[in-house]
Structures are given as C-alpha cells and as structure tokens.
C-alpha cells in the first residue's frame, strides 16, 4: 500500500508488505498481473530470502519507503531544474531580453551556490544567441522580474535540492532500526533512529522548491502569450479568431500552478 505510514515509527505498513514478498509471502504485481509473492519471485528467477536474527526488524522498522519516494522525487526535480534554466533562456531570447542580469559579478555579490550556477547556466545557453546580440545596444535598461530574477528563483530551488540530496544521502547510509546492536561493546541500545522527521522536512522543502519553479515558469508563459507585455502576436498566433494559439496552454499552466500550491502544503506539520 502507498498509504498507512505516518513515519513516526518507520514505514512499518508499506515495508511489511514489501518485505513479505522478499521472503516469498504476500502479493506482488508482475507484468500487470497480481500474484502471490512466491510466484512473483519465481517469475523473475529470484530465490526467497532466508532471514537471520534481527533482519526482519531491520527490513520494516526504518525509513526505506520514504527514502525511495524522496529519491525518485529528487531525481525528477533535478531534471526539471535543468530544463527550467533552458526554458528561461529561450524565453529571454523570445522576449528580446538582455544577458546583463546574469553577469557573474552580480551573483558573486550574493554568493548563493545555486544562484551562481543558474546564472552561469543561462549565460552559457545564450552565449552565441544571434537574437540577443542583435539588440544588445537598445535603450531598455532592465527586463521584467520573470526574466531578470530567474537565477535567484531557480538558484534557490537548486540549493534546496542540494540540501535534500544531503539528507537523503545520509539517510540511505544510516541504520534506522531499533534496537541497535553494537558488537564491539556487546551492547543493545534502544533509540529513535526510525523517526522520519529529517526526511519529512526535507521532502516538504523539495515540494515547495518545485512549486516555485512552476510559479515563475507560468508567469513567463503568460508574458509570452500577452501581446501587451511581449510585443508578439496574441497567444503566439498570427491569425487569431478560430485559432486560439497557445491560450489554452497558458490556462493549463495556471491551473497546474494553483494545484501545486495545495500539493506543496507541508505534510510534516500534520503528522
């Protein structure tokens, strides 16, 4: 089951179901078919595990399920952030923006690592842009926030993702069951390493950072389709009327951004 764990005593419910399959019990889905754990292992030529003393507890009394979900979400978030830098750079070209806001000196004056990296990425992407070069001597002093502040917004998300990566890395290499056995001193110590709070806060942070990437992206889309702001044909289509161009695409983006705000509400404060 995807639900049933509050994380305060490890992921007992989902991990129990996963672990049952590992020993040939329970149920699993293979190639779209639901079957017994024993048949699922046989279908993949895997022998059931024979657990030794203490291994059953280690399998279920930890944060492995949260780690797995966090890893998948972080992987997608990092990929999303790379594409966000590319999309912002393309928007800068389309809206006849300037690269001056990405000058390294600006970002060294406020040296957040993510901000510096985002600005560097956007400079690199646009360095040979003939479109931007064609109007570099125009009278415009500065661009709209959605373009000019892209490194600051994207960079904050980059830094958030780096923090989440560190938390997940520590958790992946940690021992989270209880009780812990220390052979060198021949001691059994009870503790609370199974508690999921470090991961919960990190994953909430991850969700907020992703939502912010979407917010500024949607605002750039709105600027692109709005002729009063972009100087381009309305909804990026020459002949309006029957053809509404990218109007609905912007509507969809706005709807997704609103949905993200609810999804990004911190779950850790209500658990």
Residue ranges and their predicted role:
Residues 1-6, 48, 188-197, 236-243:
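A short glycine/serine-rich beta->alpha loop
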Residues 2-22, 58-67, 72, 76-89, ...:
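Conserved phosphate/anionic-ligand binding catalytic regions in large, soluble enzymes, centered on
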Residues 8-23, 142-166, 241-254:
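Long, acidic, intrinsically disordered low-complexity segments
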Residues 14-123, 127, 263-271:
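Mobile "lid/hinge" segments at catalytic clefts and subdomain interfaces of large enzymes
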Residues 42-51, 183-190, 230-238:
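Glycine/charged-rich beta-loop-alpha catalytic/anionic-binding loops adjacent to active sites
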Residues 56-62, 177-185, 224-228:
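Active-site-adjacent bridging/hinge elements
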Residues 92-215, 231:
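Accessory "access/gating" subregions that flank catalytic or transport cores
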Residues 197-271:
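C-terminal catalytic subdomain
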